Amino acid sequence: MAYWNYNPEIAARKKKNADIFRETTKLIQAGGYITPSGKQIRFDFTRMLQQGKCFQQEIPIVSSPSVEGGTKVMVESNDCLVAAERLVKEGYNPVLLNFASAGHPGGGVETGARAQEETICRRSTLTRSIYSFDAKYASRYGYALQAGEHYPIVSEFSAVYSPAVTVFREGIDCLFMEEPYDVAVVTCAALNLNGKYPIKLTPDGHMPQAAIDITRNKIRTVFRIGLTYGHDSLVLGAFGCGAFKNPPAEIAKLFHEVMEEPEFKNKYRLITFSIIEDHNSNNRNLRAFEAEFGVAPKRAKLPAPDNITSLQPNQIFVFGSVCKV
């Protein structure tokens, strides 16, 4: 007989995460929120909905001028949303890579999962975009289904571009930000090599050639989308190196190889790999990227990944009325 190993601490954490996301959804549907100081923030979805796009076919090669001084590469132990905020404040126009679930926009955010995609969805308006590219989710949340291609995003050229995503929750406790910021997001699914799908790791734990070829095209797709829409910087990370079991050293090498291709070499002002080690990574990801790019990682002082305490009595506004959530 099989037993389910119930952990009340994990269950409580997942419930809290799910509660936070439900609140985030209410705020998105309400159109904004009230900051702790009482300032009213309104979301503007115009650009997101007008310029957002789901890609399923190979994007044509992009011809872009090289940047003066070449591309600066960083590896940092940091929250990807904090890294994106820093770049925005420094005057960059970044695009952030969201490590997607191929079949379910937002992954397990509704049930409190805590991987990178779910974290982004809890803390921003991203689901307002990606849910509108899936008929089931668009219907569930009352959003109009976007024209064109839709989920699932399973091919080597599949991705969703979401401009002007508003990040409005802090990393610690997901509290409301006094000064939210907008950032573009590319949602792309890494290849799942955890053994449950046809393409698997080799017996000695390496990526087979089929996985290498597919992943290289996924990376090219992300880079091309960024250049197509005029972005000058990328916030990347250990793509697929958690639960999907992609070897971090090989993923880092693939990123490096694509960056050196003539189409992409020195076309971005800055590329940063923002990496947080978690229960899936066994502390290998940051070291692998540091070794590949030969740079010492910038280490931010981060809270424990599970440091999510009780929600504050935040407020939302609905058509001008202030309400408690």
Mark where each language-model region is:
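Macrodomain-like recognition of ADP-ribose-binding/processing modules
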Residues: 1-234, 238-325
